[in-house]
UniProtKB/Swiss-Prot annotation:
UniProt xrefs under Pfam families: UreD (PF01774)
HAMAP family linked to this entry: UreD
Known role: Required for maturation of urease via the functional incorporation of the urease nickel metallocenter.
Subunit structure: UreD, UreF and UreG form a complex that acts as a GTP-hydrolysis-dependent molecular chaperone, activating the urease apoprotein by helping to assemble the nickel containing metallocenter of UreC. The UreE protein probably delivers the nickel.
Protein name, as recorded: Urease accessory protein UreD 2
Lineage: Bacteria, Pseudomonadati, Pseudomonadota, Alphaproteobacteria, Hyphomicrobiales
Keyword Chaperone: yes
Protein's cellular compartments: Cytoplasm
GO terms for MF: nickel cation binding
Organism: Brucella canis (strain ATCC 23365 / NCTC 10854 / RM-666)
Family in the record: Belongs to the UreD family.
Gene Ontology CC terms: cytoplasm
Keyword Signal assigned: no
Gene behind the chain: ureD2
Amino acid sequence: MLGKARELANYQDEPEQLPTGSFGKNAFLRLGFERRPERTVLATLHRRAPLIVQQALYWDEGMPTLPCVSIISNAGGILQGDRYAIEIDLEPDTQAHVTTQSATRIQEMDANFATQTQTITLGANSYLEYIPHPIIPHKHSRFVQQTEVTIHPTATLIYSEVLMAGRKYYGTGELFHYDLFSSKFHAAHTDGTSLFTEKFIVEPARGNVSRLGAMGSFHVFGNLILLTPKTHADRLFETIDPVFDMDEGIAWGASRLPNDAGLLFKVLGMESAPVRAAIRKIWEAARQEVTSASLPENFLWA
């Protein structure tokens, strides 16, 4: 059970407001994509507020048959005692793009914690872009996320995560004032073969996050996990050169995942825009490699 994670041992007290996981704090979302003759459709949609999805739209000019889904929250952010669960299921030969409406704000907490579990299943020859907006942890917030991926060897997943240092421009600034951010990602093939696990725990009060070997002088962390067949991963890896440019405030690099699972791309930056732009470059290259489709111009408001 995610709430029993070791790093949450000090945050088991109940909020004085609504009880943990009660109505309005126990969000659930299930998205099921199926193939139709002309395109992929969002065939299954189950939702429980605060997580909301209205419908799939087809606005991607590079892939006109790609259903694009925005996850919306009507809660104004993730609050103490919230328990979120998201399930995304792609049938064979389907394609989908999933994002969030805006940045995910993890609100300030004085009791308990918040969790989110994500379960993603990709069938044969399926393709998923899961590109949420950044996560902004507020002062004293505690958040644990666990992502479980089951993927067919012929499928592709582009999964990104951007973590801000906090509300950098709020008042005198909140940089690494949150209590806990924990994120675990595990991937396995559909036959049960485990591919890899990555987990990082950030507890700024227990260690200097700005030290060498961690964030250094950077404020934004970007993580892109590309699960794809080895032939695609090999070609993409050869095109990615590491960058470390303090004048521009950006650094990135790529490495291969264990068991020929794909690639891992990490970015550090001072602001979110350059980090997201770097992730977008890899996303664009991966889409071109796997689907031969282009990525449309970014929206002016994105």
